[in-house]
Design a protein with these regions (language model features):
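Residues on the lipid-exposed face of transmembrane beta-strands in outer-membrane beta-barrel proteins
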Residues: 1-3, 34, 62-68, 86, ...
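Outer membrane beta-barrel transmembrane domains
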Residues: 42-44, 167, 172-281
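Transmembrane beta-strand segments that form the barrel wall of outer-membrane beta-barrel proteins
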Residues: 12, 143-155, 228-229, 254-260
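Long, hydrophobic/aromatic-enriched structural stretches that serve as scaffold segments
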Residues: 16-98
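Short loop/turn motifs that connect adjacent beta-strands in outer-membrane beta-barrel proteins
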Residues: 3-28, 69-81, 133-147, 173-201
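Extracellular loop and loop/strand-boundary signature of outer-membrane beta-barrel proteins
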Residues: 48-51, 109-116, 152, 225-229, ...
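Residues that define the transmembrane beta-barrel architecture of outer-membrane proteins
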Residues: 1, 28, 56-60, 80, ...
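Sequence/structural signature of outer-membrane beta-barrel proteins
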Residues: 39-43, 71, 89-93, 133-137, ...
Length: 281
């Protein structure tokens, strides 16, 4: 995510049609990304996958993000984020090729159920989010504190949901970012990193709740028949804990995520980690 004097026309056209966003901010940034995500059931050795588990799916997509930030007054900052994501779900996304070759390289279990994956379908998501950050009291050893509240909505044929949550942080040079970037759906953190000191870092904890209207990776294709589950949960939540450190213009962050069950037959909550490396520009 880089500083920008103006927003790319296509992204600006979308942003102007989202009434909850205000991108006329003091600081404007935009960025672009190419990503690939794979979903599989728990038992990948079965040639006929468990119908009560999530279907095989791959999602290859490009996204454009616009971030507008302004300081409202002493100790309070507002950030608006708009993201447009366009991609392909299905065999064309290459999930089978990537997983099978990766498992061959690692000499791991061969996945056998990709024949039942979701069918090809173009995917579109538009995300709008507002975050309000409040500076907390200063502590001994020059420690800083802050907390943030955020809310947003994502609309599209891939996923449609509303989210709200909060985060608290403790450390040094907290103004360098709004939290480390993570794979959506996730807590706010737009990937903006701008260090104010040569060295800094923080620990953080956050929670987010989501009301989910659609998730293609559980509900199946929207425009084509195929694999799906019937017992997706309409509400979900994440608990996230982590640490971020930066030296100069490079930041490394680790996030531990505890995610509630996404469907009734799921064997338990998901627990996973995310590592990100950011370079200030």
């Amino acid at each position: 995510v880089r500083p920008a004097n103006r927003v790319t026309p296509g992204l600006n056209w979308v942003a102007n049609r989202i009434p909850i966003l205000d991108l006329d901010r003091t600081e404007l940034r935009q960025g672009f990304a190419l990503s690939h995500t794979i979903f599989t059931p728990e038992d990948i050795e079965a040639e006929i996958p468990d119908q009560t588990d999530r279907p095989y799916a791959a999602w290859l997509y490009a996204s454009g993000t616009v971030v507008g930030t302004t300081r409202l007054g002493p100790g309070q900052t507002v950030q608006d984020v708009m993201q447009v994501t366009l991609g392909i779900v299905g065999p064309t996304a290459g999930g089978e090729f990537v997983q099978e070759n990766w498992h061959d390289l690692l000499q791991a279990i061969e996945p056998r159920g990709w024949e039942s994956q979701l069918k090809d379908e173009l995917g579109l998501e538009i995300t709008a989010q507002r975050l309000r950050q409040f500076e907390g009291p200063a502590l001994p050893f020059r420690l800083e504190t802050d907390n943030a509240l955020h809310g947003g909505v994502t609309l599209g044929n891939v996923r449609t949901y509303a989210s709200a949550g909060g985060m608290a942080r403790l450390g040094w040079d907290l103004s360098s970012d709004f939290g480390p970037p993570r794979i959506r759906p996730a807590l706010a953190g737009a990937g903006v990193f701008k260090p104010g000191q040569p060295f800094g870092g923080y620990i953080f904890a956050g929670i987010e709740g989501r009301a989910i209207a659609r998730d293609m990776f559980l509900d199946g294709n929207l425009f084509r028949d195929g694999a799906r589950i019937e017992d997706r949960r309409d509400f979900g939540a994440d608990l996230q804990l982590g640490v971020a450190l930066h030296q100069g213009d490079v930041q490394i962050a680790f996030t531990y995520v505890h995610r509630t069950e996404e469907f009734v037959a799921q064997s338990g909550p998901q627990r996973f980690g995310a590592v990100s490396i950011s370079i200030a520009r």
